[in-house]
Amino acid sequence: MSNEVKKNEELIEKLVSVKRHSKTVKGGRIMSFAALTVVGDGKGRIGVGRGKSREVPAAIQKAMENAKKNMVSVNLNNDTLWYPVMSNHGASKVFMQPASAGTGIIAGGAMRSVFEAVGVHNVLAKTYGSTNPANVVRATIAGLAKIKSPDEIAEKRGLSVEEIQG
């Protein structure tokens, strides 16, 4: 469970977790490995991927390729969020709120990898319920994906940004 950081084609690749699986057959146990990775460009694009193979490096490679195929765009306010947001996936619930410059990433485990890959540098975050890395990563990305900028909200409501921000 290391956090490997690699810059490849301007993408930040993070390994979130590696788990060992076993299948019991007549002749014994067959081991395989499952990897969970996060890929981002540091500018608001993020993807999550899973890969499974008999060897760890092959599982990680498959997960990285899968993450690159499943990238989504996130709306950020420079290096933080626009407003507090709560999201869940399965039994995992995550709460994220913007932080002032210099605060850093105050988040645990799998959430930290997502924030580093997407390009968020100042955020306060907390996980409630299950801390299963797969569910926490998906909940974090879902929460980030539903954030809208004041410009988008104003356009949707047919108002000016000043009227919305009061």
Curated annotation (Swiss-Prot):
The gene is rpsE. It holds the Pfam family Ribosomal_S5_C. With S4 and S12 plays an important role in translational accuracy. Located at the back of the 30S subunit body where it stabilizes the conformation of the head with respect to the body. Keywords: Ribonucleoprotein, Ribosomal protein, RNA-binding, rRNA-binding. It comes from Francisella tularensis subsp. tularensis (strain SCHU S4 / Schu 4). Part of the 30S ribosomal subunit. Contacts proteins S4 and S8. The keyword Ribonucleoprotein applies. It comes from the Bacteria. Residues 11-74 form the S5 DRBM domain. One of its GO terms (biological process) is translation. One of its GO terms (cellular component) is small ribosomal subunit. GO terms for molecular function: rRNA binding; structural constituent of ribosome. This is Small ribosomal subunit protein uS5. Belongs to the universal ribosomal protein uS5 family. The N-terminal domain interacts with the head of the 30S subunit; the C-terminal domain interacts with the body and contacts protein S4. The interaction surface between S4 and S5 is involved in control of translational fidelity. The keyword RNA-binding applies.
